[in-house]
A protein has these predicted regions:
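N-terminal ordered "arm"
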Residues: 2-55
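Short, hydrophobic/amphipathic alpha-helical patches that form generic packing surfaces
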Residues: 17-28, 93-100, 158-165, 211-219
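Charged, alpha-helical interface segments at or near domain boundaries
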Residues: 36-129
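Acidic, Ser/Thr-rich peripheral helices and adjacent loops at domain boundaries
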Residues: 52-60, 189-203
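Short coil/turn segments at secondary-structure boundaries
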Residues: 75-79, 177, 226-233
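Internal, well-folded beta-alpha domain core
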Residues: 104-195
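Long, compositionally biased intrinsically disordered terminal regions
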Residues: 171, 182-188, 199-264
Length: 264
């Protein structure tokens, strides 16, 4: 492997930009001390190198990794979506190991680089799986479904196949508040777009009615004698609760008791 240098690579934050930075590392025959996105970069006393995204260079890295093995490519592709510390540097170090050891690098779990990346990807998959059950949609007046989530990792690309297949004829938006981006599904077209400061439309009477019904159902099916908050937090950690209507006491069934449902 190349020698570690004191240079920091700064890229535009995109996956193509990261792959370009990896290419530059190989071309320069150096392992930069850090590879960071420009929005995460902090001034340093050491030399910095701005890497301009080059689709052709990125594609060469992509094709090279795919030629090694699908597992290697998926580790890099999914690693980019994780919240692991110093993600760009970790992925670059991993790619250098891949070029040295080949596909067998995936079995080198005792190595710190491989271990950290593997654990980060596993955490990403686990979090995205949880969100397939924890996403709660609200319906707006134009019949668009909206939801807000606050994940640690960038889970929207992994959630897209599940929800697009589940609601093929609906229009919906899932807003990732942590990473300021949204998954949009409309007219059977999928997009993941940057989005800052999204606020859900004010809930109408119909929406409030069903929130209260769901809260009432959640409270009713609970078995008081088996109440175990620690067990519940193991399966449904508290950080997911902010966007769950069943955990919001304002959705009390008393608020709609005696209210006639619209259209009923």
């Amino acid at each position: 492997m190349s020698a570690r240098s004191d240079v920091t690579y700064v890229y535009d934050g995109s996956f193509e930009g990261l792959l370009t930075a990896v290419f530059e590392s190989f071309e320069s025959r150096e392992l930069p001390c850090s590879i960071v996105a420009e929005d995460e970069f902090a001034p340093t006393l050491f030399a910095c190198k701005t890497v301009d995204t080059d689709p052709q260079k990125a594609d060469r890295v992509r094709r090279g990794l795919k030629n090694v093995s699908a597992d290697v490519w998926n580790a890099v592709r999914l690693g980019y979506l994780t919240c692991v510390e110093d993600r760009g540097t970790l992925i670059n170090d991993f790619v250098h190991m891949v070029m040295h050891y080949g596909a067998g690098v995936m079995r080198m779990l005792a190595d710190d680089t491989v271990s950290r990346l593997t654990k980060a990807v596993r955490a990403l998959k686990q979090e995205s799986h949880k969100y397939t059950g924890f996403v709660r949609f609200s319906i707006s007046e134009d019949n668009t479904l909206t939801s807000i989530i606050e994940p640690k990792n960038s889970v929207l690309p992994l959630l897209a196949p599940h929800f697009c297949d589940r609601y093929p004829n609906e229009s919906f938006l899932i807003y990732d508040k942590t990473h300021s981006q949204a998954l949009v599904w409309h007219n059977r077209q999928k997009m993941i777009i940057p989005l800052d400061g999204f606020e859900q439309p004010q809930a109408g009477d119909e929406e409030l009615y069903f929130r209260a019904l769901w809260k009432h159902f959640y409270d009713t099916v609970a078995i008081e004698a088996r109440y175990n908050p620690r067990c519940r937090m193991n399966f449904m950690p508290k950080r997911y609760w902010n966007q769950l209507p069943e955990m919001d006491e304002s959705n009390s069934p008393d608020a709609v008791r005696g209210v006639k449902r619209i259209g009923a």
